[in-house]
Structures are given as structure tokens and as C-alpha cells.
Amino acid sequence: MSKKVGIGCAIIVGIIIIFGIILVSYGVGSYNKIVQLNESVKEKWSQVENVYQRRYDLIPNLVETVKGYASHEKETFTAVTEARAKAGGTFNISDKVLNDPQMFQKFQQAQASLGGALQRLMVVIEKYPELKANQNFLSLQDQLEGTENRITVERKRFNQTAREYNIYIKRFPRVIIANMFGFKEKLYFKSQEGAETAPKVKF
């Protein structure tokens, strides 16, 4: 009888061990997947920052070129310069911005303001058709148009990756693992008027 009890206990212990191994394996696999997705979000965010930085870097040359033909449009130039300065202050603030609603909103608003200022500059440029003969301006136009398109593409890619990460960590029982190791839901770009469409820069 004691032998049967011993065998029964051994079976129970074996089942517990097997269950424990499965549980640990699942936990390790889920943790590694969360880490992988988290790194993907960071990488996509870096690409978003890079294309916004590219636009930021193009603006001084664009403004100086336009000034050569429309030097009296000081109000517009000032608006672009100020918006650029504010946008520049939101770069390189680490990926912690993705967990901070205020910081993320500040970044998004600053970039949107700069985009709006550039659109007003485009309206001014329409008054000066002779600009279209300036080779430097034409080159900047092509670069800016390409950059605006890249911004739209990289924002969409980032949103897709962030949503995939969020869905993964919110499902049970992975949500327990995510909470244990401090993985939080990521913010992403919300749909706004013009947010998913690159501004037209055809002059």
C-alpha cells in the first residue's frame, strides 16, 4: 500500500515538475518576445525622429533661399524659425516619451506646428514664381517632399509596431509578465486631420 502511495506521490511530483517547466518555458518565451517587440518599438521610434530631424535640418537652407526673393515676408520667416526652434527642443529626449502622455503630446504638437508653419511658407512661395527657376530651391523642394513622405511612412510603421506590442502585453497571462518586469503600454500617433497624409510641397 505504501508502495502505491509512493508511486502516486512520485507521479504527482512529476506532474508538478512538468507543469513548472512548461510554465517557466512559457514565461521565458513571453518575456523574450516582449523584449523583442519593445526593441522594435524603440527602433521604429528612432526612425520617426530621424525623418523629423531631416526636415528640421532642411528648413534653414529653404528659408534662406526664399528670403532671396521675398525678404519682406518677415512674419512668415519668424513663424517658421520659432516653430523650428520648438520642434528642435523635442528631439533626443529618449524613448521614455512613449510612456509619458505629456511629453508625447508636446513632441506631436511641436512637429505639427512646424508643419503648419511650413505650409504657410508654401503659400508665400506661390507669390514668387521666379523661385521655380532657382536650382537650389528646386533641389530643396525635392528633398522636402521626399522627407514629408518618409515622415508619413515612418509614423505608420511606428504605429503598427506599437500597436502590436500593446496587444501582445495586454493579453492574459502575458500581462502578468509585462507588469512584473515593468513593460508598459506605448503611446502612438493618433489620427488627426492631415496626420496620415504628407503635406504637399509642390510649388
Each predicted region: which residue ranges?
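A helix-centric hydrophobic-segment signal that preferentially recognizes long
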Residues: 2-203
